[in-house]
């Protein structure tokens, strides 16, 4: 599988291409503090088998990409969106199907607004619309209060995950088990959690990065202003919003709320899916994405 190191200003980004470069390009944008390896190989193989040349990459401050001193050189979502475009440039891709999860969901919306000519389609999941103040909703959840947005706040599982990540872990074994426990909580209660499956993935991700320590920098990045949500009405890219029905971070109807703000956007609900990508959801998730990309190219 070919890899490329791509430079965007002073940042170097690790990226990987899978499949036939002659096939329709599809860019995967991972969640916060996650590397390219957060997209499971088995899931990527389904996208490749459906006729896509899949590109995945490490966000800055993850995996094998550049580490930044955030205090001295802070960055935000505009820079992360520029990184995604730099990856496309690095693979000589003029326009691609884009799939973003969690933090990548936000980046995808910004790309649809600011660089629509680079998107063939957009699929977003495991996140909210730009007009939702997630930080305010999270604070409300911590206080046991209703959300500012009127949408469901993150669940207790998500709050438990945040608390768990603050607990000390020193050895590689402790760090690994904490990573697995994080995914158990994010997985939700719909799909039975396979600890061995996620342990294998986390060993792969840690080996890729060269450390069991998890990045935390993306937690410091301010969200885009909610005023940008009003701009979603001018999006012309075909958009699919996937609602994971057991997502503890962005419960239903967050995807429906997002789709209602974008002309022509569609919603697909995936039963039992949480804020994770266990093997059990790969088939319906890949099928939904590929049906969306095919429909846009007919």
Curated annotation (Swiss-Prot):
Residues covered by the AB hydrolase-1 domain: 25-277
Keywords: Antibiotic biosynthesis, Hydrolase
Pfam family, one: Abhydrolase_1
SUPFAM superfamilies in alphabetical order: alpha/beta-Hydrolases
Keyword Hydrolase: yes
GO molecular function: carboxylesterase activity; triacylglycerol lipase activity
This protein's record includes keyword Nucleus: no
Pathway: Antibiotic biosynthesis; daunorubicin biosynthesis; Antibiotic biosynthesis; carminomycin biosynthesis
Transmembrane regions: none
EC top class named in words: hydrolase
EC number(s) given by UniProt: 3.1.1.-
Domain of life: Bacteria
Recorded catalytic activity of this chain's protein: rhodomycin D + H2O = 10-carboxy-13-deoxycarminomycin + methanol + H(+); 4-O-methylrhodomycin D + H2O = 10-carboxy-13-deoxydaunorubicin + methanol + H(+)
GO biological process, one term: glycerolipid catabolic process
Function recorded in the entry: Involved in the biosynthesis of the anthracyclines carminomycin and daunorubicin (daunomycin) which are aromatic polyketide antibiotics that exhibit high cytotoxicity and are widely applied in the chemotherapy of a variety of cancers. Catalyzes the removal of methyl group from the carbomethoxy group of rhodomycin D (10-carbomethoxy-13-deoxycarminomycin) and 4-O-methylrhodomycin D to yield 10-carboxy-13-deoxycarminomycin and 10-carboxy-13-deoxydaunorubicin, respectively.
Recorded family membership: Belongs to the methyl esterase DnrP family.
Cross-referenced PANTHER family: AB HYDROLASE-1 DOMAIN-CONTAINING PROTEIN, HYDROLASE, ALPHA/BETA FOLD FAMILY PROTEIN
Protein name: Rhodomycin D methylesterase DnrP
Organism field: Streptomyces peucetius
């Amino acid at each position: 599988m070919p890899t490329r190191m791509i430079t965007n200003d002073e940042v170097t980004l690790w990226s990987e291409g899978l499949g036939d470069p002659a096939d329709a390009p599809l860019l995967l944008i991972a969640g916060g503090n996650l590397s390219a390896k957060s997209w499971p190989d088995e899931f990527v193989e389904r996208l490749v088998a459906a006729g896509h040349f899949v590109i995945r990459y490490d966000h800055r401050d993850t995996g094998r990409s550049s580490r930044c001193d955030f205090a001295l050189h802070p960055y935000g979502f505009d820079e992360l969106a520029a990184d995604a475009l730099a990856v496309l440039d690095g693979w000589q891709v003029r326009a691609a199907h884009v799939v973003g999860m969690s933090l990548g969901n936000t980046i995808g919306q910004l790309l649809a607004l600011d660089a629509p000519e680079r998107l063939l389609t957009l699929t977003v999941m495991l996140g909210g619309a730009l007009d939702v103040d997630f930080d305010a909703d999270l604070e409300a959840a911590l206080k046991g209060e209703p959300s500012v947005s009127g949408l469901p706040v993150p669940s207790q599982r998500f709050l438990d995950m945040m608390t768990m990540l603050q607990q000390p872990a020193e050895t590689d074994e402790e760090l690994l088990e904490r990573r697995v426990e994080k995914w158990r909580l994010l997985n939700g209660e719909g799909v039975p959690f396979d600890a061995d499956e996620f342990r294998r993935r986390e060993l792969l991700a840690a080996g890729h990065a060269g450390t069991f320590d998890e990045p935390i920098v993306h937690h410091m990045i301010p969200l885009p202003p909610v005023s940008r949500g009003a701009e979603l009405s001018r999006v012309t890219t075909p958009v699919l919003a996937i609602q994971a029905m057991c997502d503890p971070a962005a419960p239903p109807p967050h995807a429906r709320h997002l789709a209602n703000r974008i002309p022509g956007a569609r919603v697909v609900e995936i039963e039992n899916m949480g804020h994770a990508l266990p093997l059990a959801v790969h088939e319906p998730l890949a099928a939904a994405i590929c049906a969306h990309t095919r429909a846009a190219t007919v």
